[in-house]
Structure formats: C-alpha cells, structure tokens
Amino acid sequence: MKIETPNPIKILIYGEERIDFIQNIITNDILNETKSLYSYILTPQGKILFEIQINLMNDCLEIICSNDQSDLLSYLEKYAKLSDISLQKFQLDKANFGESYFLDSLKMGKIDTNFLPHSTLNPSEVHDEYINYQKGCFVGQEVVSRIKHRQLQKKNILIFEKNNQNALNLPDDFELLIEFKNFLVLRLPKNIEYLNFESELGLRKI
C-alpha cells in the first residue's frame, strides 16, 4: 500500500456553546477532559465517519483530522445551525501526515482510521477507548450501545508485523485492510487466539 496524499485539516470552534455542541456529536466525553482527547464521529448507522483529536484551548476547541475524507467542516456546519458557535477551517501541512506519520503510528500500535475505509468499520473494533458508553446521546449511539451491551461485536482490528514472506498466507476469515512496509492491519474474528501467530503465520502482534 502507498499512503496517498492525505487531507489533514484543523477546525477551530468558537462560542459559548462549543462544549455542548461537540459533546452531542462525538463518541467520547469531553466533559471529563481538560486538555485533549481522541474521539470518533459516527454515521447514524454507527460506522466511523471521522477520527479526531480535540484540544481544549482557552477560547476555542481545536479539532484535528489527519485525513479528512468526508468534509468534516460541512458535517459540523449541518449541526451548528442551532448552536451559538462559529467554525474556522485551516489546511495542515501534508508532510506531517504522510508515510512517516502512518508508520510511526503502526509501530506504536495505533491505527489511524482516517486512512481506512470508514463506512464498514464499527468503532469498538478499533479503539474502544474512544467511546464513552455512560455519556448522553451522540450520533450513532443507539447502534454502538446495542453492540456493546448485547455483545454483538464479532471482529477486532489489530496490527501485526511480518517476520517472513509467508505471512500473507492468511486464513480465509482474516480480512487484510492494509499492508504497509512490514506491517499488516487485519480484521480478525474477535475470539481468535493469536498467541501462536508468530510461529504459525510469521506475524507478531504489535
């Protein structure tokens, strides 16, 4: 896989209602944070639409999206009509979000879902810690809560490092999402035992 030229953006949200505005959209709980947090924005069907970093500034919220695939500004503007806020969008330096950024993320065991095909991904498959199941309503909450409480999640998305060239001889129920350098991002059955992957498949979990 070659990392295509990303579309990294920053959006600043001003206004007295900025906290309440973003709280009603994101999966995480900004009321419990004072500096920064990661979160998802979902479709009504509970699929990942955006992965964002939110930085709490003195007079605004700074929203960072490493690869804006679906026009984050237009999405926020749709919900902003009933709130006392204003939005400003800035392009970020693409060089900071290229192959080196993506490779460093994989080495640290972090999957940036802005580089994956969003429309098929459940957020709990990737970074469940980006979801606060105790907070109030947000877009897609009903779906993700049902998956959580009824234990309907069937897949996990994990990062593995290849130790040999045979690592691509994968079982049929393994879905290869990304192959980049010496790393694979795989979608696996949730309860599969991967402790023997290194000896059997030449894969080491990151």
Segment roles from a protein language model:
Residues 1-206:
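Basic, glycine/lysine-rich polyanion-binding surfaces/domains
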